Every structure is written in C-alpha cells, then in structure tokens.
Amino acid sequence: MGGIALNVVSDVVVLVHLCTRDDWRIAQQSGAHRPDSLDEIGFVHLSTPEQVHLPANRLYSGRTDLMLLRIDAARLSSPVRWEPGVPGDPGEMVFPHLYGALPVAAVISVTPYLPDADGSFPATRATHD
C-alpha cells in the first residue's frame, strides 16, 4: 500500500464511503450498496478517513444529505485494490476501490457527513467520531 496511513480502531482497518441517505436506506433493504460506479467503472469508490474530504469536496460540495459509512475492511468479500485517484489529488496518493457491492454487514457505523457553512468538507471531519 505504499506508505498509506490507515485508520485502525481496535485492530480493525477502517475504510469509508459516502452515499446519500436515500441510497443508504435502499442498501439496508437490499443488504448491499451498489452505487452507479459499480456498473459504470466496475468498482465502489472508498477512501481512508483522512482522504474522504477530497472526493467529498470534488463531488458533493454543499450537499447536506450525505452519510459517512465506516467500513471494517476485513468484512469485505470482494477485492479491494489501492489505485490512483484523479488528476488533482495529492502526489502519489492512492485510494481503495472495492470491486464488488458493499455489503451492509461490513458497515460498522453510519453518521451524517455535513459540510461547513461555506459548503466545504474539512480534512479532519471524518477522522473523528
């Protein structure tokens, strides 16, 4: 994983994913979260808690309906690959990509992920419970 700092809680590697409240409700009913990216590019975008502000600001600036899913990586049954993000992401940063649906059983907590008054998501927002 090339120097990636992972958020570990009680020997659990924690990854995170953002989705809307409605998408989370659907996932709870079906047992898995299947975002459009799974069909479009073959994987679910994940992040570390330290990275999640980057895609949040790029894709969801100002949105107030986001949920932060904290995921126990050991509970994922599909492969996770660490791959480059998009142009503009810092240097050699790689992101975890889940090559399959995100099982609800792998999600260990769900909290609202709200922006600051200016619509941006600060870098430290997801690193604290």
What annotation goes with each model-predicted range?
Residues G2-D129:
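Conserved, structured core segments of small domains
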